[in-house]
Amino acid sequence: ILVVPSAEHHLDTDLEDEVMLNFVKKVNKDAEFITSHCDGAFVLAEAGLLKNKVSTTFPTDIEKMRKRYPNLDIREDVLFVHDGKYITSAGGAKSFEAALYLCEYLYGKNIAESLSAGLVIDWDLANVAHVVIK
């Protein structure tokens, strides 16, 4: 699992960092899942990983992402999107929802609930705005 965090204050330079982008592309070949949080979705898009995928990003940056990547399907009003091996999230404190979702997906509801209790988060996937593409 590769986790791509927010690139706040470094987004422009990160999107020009060929070493990092090539690393993400290389890891993508064998990764079971790649998650992005906040503006980390821009890195996935720049690496070409979100072509023909549905994604999201930090709410106030959705329009910026749509302008930069006009051919991508970028959703708003959701906390995370799971499409294939990619899970993109709105980020911030809401990154926990995407992480708990992946834990539930991989290990079951009981494990996700146990983890959420340790984080003092009321976890119920049915109450989390999200999109899952099959």
Question: Over which residues does each language-model region extend?
Answer:
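Active-site-adjacent pocket-lining segments in enzyme domains
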Residues: 1-134
